Regions:
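Membrane-interface amphipathic segments in extracytoplasmic regions
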Residues: 2-340
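Helical coiled-coil/dimerization "stalks"
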Residues: 339-366
Length: 366
């Protein structure tokens, strides 16, 4: 019988999280580098794209910027475009679309997805386009400055984007992100005794962590796109996604109609229970997103009646949350066993080496 440890979840999942986007595992206060570590000499080792962003956002951690571009940028020198993705803003849709347009390499499976088609799309290698950081500096500069290059991103109404992240990642205790439930309630719930984190509670959690590098699913969109430095020629919106797809098709001279993949449908849609007061708190957290991307401060969603479902919302949520908690604990045990295996393996190698030395030394002494 497995005895579950009570170690901090973030420590237990650290080895597995390394398979995911590095920007999702950022530590608190990583936004600004230590004093003296961002001198002109230090910037020499970074690519043109990273240096360009740091010129416009001097307080950012260079490594965080580099990691973010390596995972969330898609470049084509031949077709003259650069796409910067934003989580919870059609990013999965765009991955599937780009994968279809540029070929389909063998999917790299992520731990825990067990061959799931949608899950494996999140491996960076599943989209056969290089990040801009993988290009030569001259090509990076050309993509960032040439007037004929389509430099685009896709953003979303901050109100609905945050609700989407809450429904998909927080309510269901997603095992692949930091444990918001434990941060809000003080501990991870026992299986069968979970009470989903309400949207207002999630907003309070964000308010208490301002100044940290948030998970990419609810990080401010300006912190994912660096608009001051990347000189976008087109900023698309989830609400008018077909227009962005049309512009991309024209840029790459794709003559056929591009069908937008229909994904991320949810069976249950718990209400965020937006009020004017709650919306004002969300607006304060994402004010720069509203201002930079042209979203109305009064555009928060009104509650809508959930569509019918053969099971109750509470029953459905309990089932999915329990499943995710089990995955989390299995991941924790997997990480522990991996560490023990590595320790035993190293010890076994040392024993073999000692035996070989004992055999070889007498022969040399003859």
């Amino acid at each position: 019988m497995i005895a579950w440890r009570t170690d901090d979840l973030s420590v237990a999942l650290a080895p597995l999280k390394q398979s995911f986007s590095p920007r999702l595992v950022a530590k608190p206060n990583d936004l600004a580098p230590p004093p003296g570590e961002c001198s002109g000499e230090a910037l020499v080792s970074f690519s043109y794209a990273v240096s360009r962003i740091l010129d416009g956002y001097s307080v950012l951690d260079p490594k965080l910027v580099k990691d973010q571009l390596e995972y969330g940028s898609y470049a084509s020198v031949k077709d003259r475009f650069l796409y910067i993705e934003v989580y919870k803003a059609a990013s999965t849709t765009m991955r599937i679309l780009l994968r279809g347009l540029y070929g389909s390499p063998e999917r790299k499976l992520f731990p825990g997805f067990n061959g799931d088609t949608l899950g494996s799309i999140y491996a960076r290698e599943s989209v056969p386009l290089p990040p801009i950081t993988a290009l030569e500096d001259k090509d990076q500069r050309e993509l960032l400055e040439a007037p004929d290059v389509l430099r685009f991103t896709i953003v979303r109404n901050p109100y609905t984007r945050l609700v989407s992240a809450w429904r998909n990642k927080v309510v269901l205790c997603d095992p692949w992100i930091d444990d918001v439930y434990a941060a809000v309630r003080g501990e991870t719930p026992p299986i069968g005794q979970q009470f989903p984190v309400e949207f207002a509670e999630f907003v309070s959690y964000l308010e208490s962590t301002v100044g940290r590098v948030w998970d990419g699913h609810w990080r401010r969109q300006i912190d994912l796109t660096f608009p001051k430095s990347l000189s976008f020629t087109h900023i698309g919106k989830v609400e008018t996604l077909q227009e962005t797809i049309r512009i991309l098709a024209g840029q790459i001279k794709y003559r056929s109609h591009i069908q937008i993949p229909n994904i991320n449908e949810v069976v249950i849609r718990p209400s965020p229970k937006y009020s004017a007061a709650l919306a004002a708190r969300v607006y304060a957290l994402y004010e720069e997103d509203f201002e930079n991307f042209g979203y109305d401060a009064k555009s928060w969603p009104q509650d809508r009646e959930d569509r019918s479902c053969p099971v109750s919302e509470r029953c459905f949520l309990d089932y999915v949350i329990a499943r995710n908690l089990i995955i989390t604990r299995l991941n924790r045990e997997c990480a522990r066993l991996r560490q023990e295996h590595d320790a035993v393996y190293r010890f076994s190698l040392a024993r073999v080496q000692n035996k070989l030395r004992a055999i070889i030394r007498p022969r040399h002494s003859r």
